[in-house]
A protein has these predicted regions:
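Donor nucleotide-activated moiety binding/catalytic core segment of transferases
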Residues: 1-36, 41
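Catalytic binding pocket for nucleotide-activated donors in carbohydrate/polymer assembly enzymes
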Residues: 4, 33-113
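Hydrophobic transmembrane alpha-helix bundles
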Residues: 13-24, 50-58, 139-142
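Short beta->alpha linker loops
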Residues: 15-16, 83-84, 119
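An acidic, carboxylate-rich microenvironment
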Residues: 19, 86-87, 123
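C-terminal alpha-helical cap of glycosyltransferases
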Residues: 117-142
């Protein structure tokens, strides 16, 4: 309600189309996975609001590896704690002003951590076919 008349802000509640998502200069979200897709494809930053995390594996800390969706937030944008919510506008403005820095940073990150960019479907399909062929061969040898 607060921003309904602000023409510079669009709040999306209908997710049947994602075209406008990728036109945005900045995404503000909580833990949504769309943040990574958005950042990787647009090289634009994400402002995360640090709401309580939905934990699928309550034992994750025993593994000793910080989950990807926690540490990656700091690589593709900024994180605001709930008690810092009043800093959202200022933080967003600073992030938009630094868009070139974020573009370079996200681009480097994608090159380092995203494999088979642009051909992952083909690579994945070939891998699955190879594994099926190996399983068939093992089955025939038994």
């Amino acid at each position: 309600e607060r921003y309904k008349d602000d023409t510079d802000i669009e709040i999306q509640t209908d997710f049947s189309s994602n075209s406008t998502v990728f036109e945005a200069d900045l995404m503000i979200t909580d833990w949504s996975g769309i943040a990574y897709e958005y950042a990787y494809t647009t090289c634009k930053p994400v402002l995360f609001i640090d709401t309580p995390m939905k934990i699928m594996n309550p034992e994750y800390k025993k593994i000793g590896i910080e989950p990807l969706n926690i540490w990656m937030r700091y690589e593709i944008g900024r994180v605001l704690k709930l008690d810092e919510i009043d800093k959202t506008a200022d933080t967003a403005a600073k992030m938009l002003a630094a868009s070139d820095t974020y573009k370079d940073s996200i681009d480097r990150f994608v090159k380092e951590y995203v494999y088979n960019l642009g051909s992952s479907a083909s690579v994945g399909a070939k891998y699955i076919i190879q594994e099926i062929q190996k399983a068939i061969k093992r089955h025939k040898e038994q």
